[in-house]
């Protein structure tokens, strides 16, 4: 039921009032590189939103080095509750991929994310 999902998300995000940030929008290892002058990111799908959205995508691509989180935390620490909000921010991408690309693994991942949000399995 979409109304139940929307209510759950609203409840979970009610006390989270992040400052809007310019987001990459498609952050994963295929859009990052390390060059002679340092790291580069490219192929953005930029928008303004919660900075946690970009970081929530990283676990969906396990090839990302864990140092990304360490570096991010050293510059701009994440507020408490990030891991609780992560499935909410992953849900859009998973549903979008399931619709666009199909495949049982994507449909299963999208269903698991929905279950995590609806069943309050969040950390």
UniProtKB/Swiss-Prot annotation:
It is an enzyme of class 2 (transferase). InterPro entries: Fructo-/Ketosamine-3-kinase (IPR016477), Kinase-like_dom_sf (IPR011009). One of its GO terms (molecular function) is kinase activity. The active site is at residue 26. Keywords: Kinase, Transferase. It comes from the Bacteria. Its EC number is 2.7.1.-. Belongs to the fructosamine kinase family. Ketoamine kinase that phosphorylates ketoamines on the third carbon of the sugar moiety to generate ketoamine 3-phosphate. This is Probable ketoamine kinase in tonB 3'region. The lineage of its organism: Bacteria, Pseudomonadati, Pseudomonadota, Gammaproteobacteria, Enterobacterales.
């Amino acid at each position: 039921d979409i109304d139940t999902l929307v209510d759950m998300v609203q409840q979970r995000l009610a006390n989270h009032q992040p400052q809007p940030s310019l987001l990459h929008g498609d952050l994963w290892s295929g859009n990052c590189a390390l060059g002679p002058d340092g790291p580069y990111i490219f192929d953005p799908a930029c928008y303004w939103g919660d900075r946690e959205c970009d970081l929530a995508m990283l676990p969906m691509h396990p090839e990302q080095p864990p140092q990304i989180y360490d570096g991010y935390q050293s510059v701009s620490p994440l507020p408490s509750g990030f891991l609780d909000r992560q499935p909410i921010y992953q849900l859009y991408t998973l549903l979008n991929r399931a619709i666009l690309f199909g495949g049982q693994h994507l449909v299963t991942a999208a269903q698991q994310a929905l279950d995590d949000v609806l069943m309050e399995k969040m950390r």
